[in-house]
């Protein structure tokens, strides 16, 4: 498993905190832990960024994960014990995405997570050289969050 670090830069221009997590990247797939620290704990209930070979429109796959109640929060959803998220993924397109570091060819994935407490979604934009460069989330409370690449160091 590769480790990666991400830093959070609000409009103020300085990092408020950073975090390290993991990525599995091999000839079959790329899978990464979502941002799940502090304000981003809600993303544990969303589909994880994940793309699987073959990279072609219409490719579908599934998996599931148990999620303990230590991820609950009164601000979005509470439950007792463990829930099971069932994930469905599909490559729905390929497009040129304009980012802050240039235009990138991206595979577009659409995914959902469904459990006893509700459903969430993710549209992921995956560039074969740089990985996931944009993530559009619909959260369990129906709020939306977009995470985009800003720079590569």
In which residue ranges do the predicted regions lie?
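Acidic, serine/threonine-rich low-complexity disordered tracts
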Residues: 1, 6-8, 70-153
């Amino acid at each position: 498993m590769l480790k990666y670090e991400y830093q959070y830069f609000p409009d103020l221009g300085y990092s408020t905190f950073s975090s390290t997590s993991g990525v599995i990247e091999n000839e079959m797939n790329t899978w990464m832990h979502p941002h799940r620290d502090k304000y981003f704990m809600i993303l544990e209930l969303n589909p994880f960024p994940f793309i699987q070979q073959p990279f072609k429109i219409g490719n579908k796959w599934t998996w599931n994960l148990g999620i303990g109640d230590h991820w609950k929060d009164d601000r979005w959803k509470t439950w007792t014990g463990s829930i099971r998220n069932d994930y469905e993924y599909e490559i729905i397109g390929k497009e040129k995405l304009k980012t802050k570091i240039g235009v990138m060819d991206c595979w577009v994935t659409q995914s959902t997570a469904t459990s006893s407490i509700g459903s969430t979604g993710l549209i992921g934009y995956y560039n074969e050289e740089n990985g996931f460069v944009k993530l559009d989330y619909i959260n369990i409370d129906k709020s939306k969050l977009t995470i985009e690449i800003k720079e590569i160091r």
